[in-house]
A protein has these predicted regions:
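Short alpha-helix
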Residues: 160-176
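Conserved class I S-adenosyl-L-methionine
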Residues: 1-36, 48-52, 71-74, 132-162, ...
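Class I SAM-dependent methyltransferase SAM/SAH-binding core
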Residues: 38-42, 46-90
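A short glycine-rich, Lys/Arg-flanked "PGG" loop and its adjoining helix->strand segment in the class I
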Residues: 117-129
Length: 254
């Protein structure tokens, strides 16, 4: 996995910057009930999306949390007084404290299924009855846009995805949440060129091909042989799922 303290300085510019953040925030807010008054953004990173969540819904109190100190510092500069340094597996908040909890581009990073379930359970715990949990799913699959780069990388070693739609739904339902909608948004500025794919490979972006892996040079050579080395291929499209916490005694609560 990438070192997100080292990654913080170049995180935004390497991942589509403000256009991608705007698309992500719009997607999340489209699943947030109009009556919501508080939102917790788990794994807020540099706060580039979190800030737009706050700006995009007047009256919504937004709090960010991230476990990487460097990321949290960037986020705190964007949202003074509203960012907490903490691990998503052990959120330092009371039960039922937030009307909405979001986790954008988080669950795909978690290698241990036990930890994935713990994160979803924590998000459910701090969610108020009637509240909504919004999270990205199938992040890795979203980057497969059918390009020539994807053809080259199709045979690379893979680990099982930790954020498949079915898995995340099973974790959410296991915590007492119920499905409440979905949305898609474009990953603007994230269409890879072959040259960019090689750079990502060299710095460990593909976790099963870390720098120094015996196969890394072979994949780099195959990417270097592709035409139009600097032409970005199509942007990915990311998927959001929403889950609601039933109000006790309501129809949805059974």
């Amino acid at each position: 996995m990438l070192d997100y303290d080292k990654e913080a300085e170049r995180y935004d510019i390497s991942r589509g910057g403000e256009p991608r953040a705007a698309a992500a925030a719009e997607g999340v807010l489209g699943l947030v009930p109009v009556q919501a008054r508080s939102l917790l953004d788990v794994a807020c990173g540099t706060g580039i999306v979190t800030r737009r969540l706050a700006a995009g819904r007047p009256g919504l109190r937004v709090t960010g949390v991230d476990r990487a100190p460097a990321m949290a510092r960037y986020a705190a500069a964007r949202l003074p007084g509203a960012v907490v340094l903490a691990d998503g597996r052990r959120l330092p908040f009371q039960d039922a404290e937030f009307d909405v909890v979001s986790s954008v581009w988080l669950l795909h990073l978690v290698e241990d299924p036990v930890d994935t379930r713990r994160i979803v359970a924590e998000c459910a715990r701090v969610l108020s009855p009637g509240g909504t949990y919004v999270t990205t799913v199938d992040k890795g699959a979203s980057h497969n846009v059918g390009s020539d780069i994807d053809v080259v990388l199709a045979s690379r070693p893979r680990r099982p995805a930790s954020d498949t739609d079915a898995l995340v739904e099973s974790y959410a339902v296991g915590c007492g949440l119920v499905p409440a909608g979905q949305a898609r948004f474009p990953g603007r500025g994230q269409g890879r060129s072959p040259r960019r794919a090689i750079a990502d490979l060299r710095r460990g972006w593909f976790v099963t091909l870390p720098p120094g892996h015996p196969l890394a040079d072979d994949f780099a050579a195959r990417l270097a042989a592709l035409p139009d080395q600097d032409r970005p291929r199509p942007d990915p499209a990311f998927t959001l799922r929403a889950f609601r916490k039933p109000v006790p005694g309501s129809f949805l609560a059974g």
